[in-house]
Amino acid sequence: MLCLPVFIILLLLASPAAPKSLETRIQNDLIRAGLTDADLKTEKGFLSGLLNVAGSVCCKVDTSCCSN
């Protein structure tokens, strides 16, 4: 009768289909979130750069569009 719990514990320890640890899943989520944030920052920087160029061209052509 005492062998049954020991056998069950050994089966659980030797299970080849053990789920990923919580720490590994958290690390993967953080890496994925970091890449998403990096993409957003690059896109915002790119768009603001385009707006600055467009604003400077507009100010050279017509001073009424400048924010001075």
Curated annotation (Swiss-Prot):
Does Secreted count among this protein's keywords?
Answer: yes
Ordered alphabetically, the record's keywords are: Disulfide bond, Secreted, Signal, Toxin
Subcellular localization: Secreted
- What cellular-component terms does GO give this entry? extracellular region
Signal peptide residues are: 1-19
Describe PTMs of this protein. Answer: Contains 2 disulfide bonds that can be either 'C1-C3, C2-C4' or 'C1-C4, C2-C3', since these disulfide connectivities have been observed for conotoxins with cysteine framework V (for examples, see AC P0DQQ7 and AC P81755).
Pro-region residues? 20-54
Identify a single GO molecular function assigned to this protein: toxin activity
- Major localization class: secreted
Mark the transmembrane ranges: none
| Entry comment describing in which tissues the protein is expressed | Expressed by the venom duct.
Asked whether the keyword Nucleotide-binding is assigned, the reply is no
Q: Name one Pfam family in it.
A: Chi-conotoxin
What's the superkingdom here?
Eukaryota
Q: Which InterPro entries match?
A: T-conotoxin
Copy the domain comment: The cysteine framework is V (CC-CC).
Q: Which family does it belong to?
A: Belongs to the conotoxin T superfamily.
Which named protein is this?
Conotoxin Lt5.2
- Which organism was this protein described from? Conus litteratus (Lettered cone)
